[in-house]
């Protein structure tokens, strides 16, 4: 695993759906060497990888993998990227402008994936223009939120309850 701080709760929840206890598996911190650890046989599974990257990296290296998405195995759905502003000093108009720019970029990428890809790789073609990034790009397209400034308070409350129940947090916030 790559240590995230919630691995016991998340992995434990997923394992329980298969009647396996967390303490019945050996957890090995491989840092960020997820793909190479799995490919080398050092570990039998990895946790902490990106949905659009490690799967593709391993496939390109000739390894067939089975993916287990946490939300399909008892872990509440959560947003993987959240922009946070200081509650005391934020600039409301700057945040609105930022969110609008993110939304416009996402809509452009979804509507014009090939043009957006060309613009992306033009930044650093020697390192970005390769098959792994092409596959990751393709898989990322389906994950974009078309309304990035929208907030699902119930989703946040459900994940907060999950973290509180598993003692990741000491107090239960209300979204």
Regions of interest found by a model, annotated:
Residues 1-2, 26:
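Short, well-ordered beta-strand elements
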Residues 2-13:
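Secondary-structure junction motif
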Residues 12-16, 59, 121, 164:
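Class I S-adenosyl-L-methionine
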Residues 18-22, 62-63, 126-127, 168:
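Short helix-capping segments at alpha-helix termini
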Residues 22-32, 67-68:
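Short beta-strand-to-loop elements that line the ligand-binding cleft
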Residues 33-124:
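Pocket-lining segment of extracytoplasmic ligand-binding domains
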Residues 91-170:
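Secondary-structure end/capping motifs
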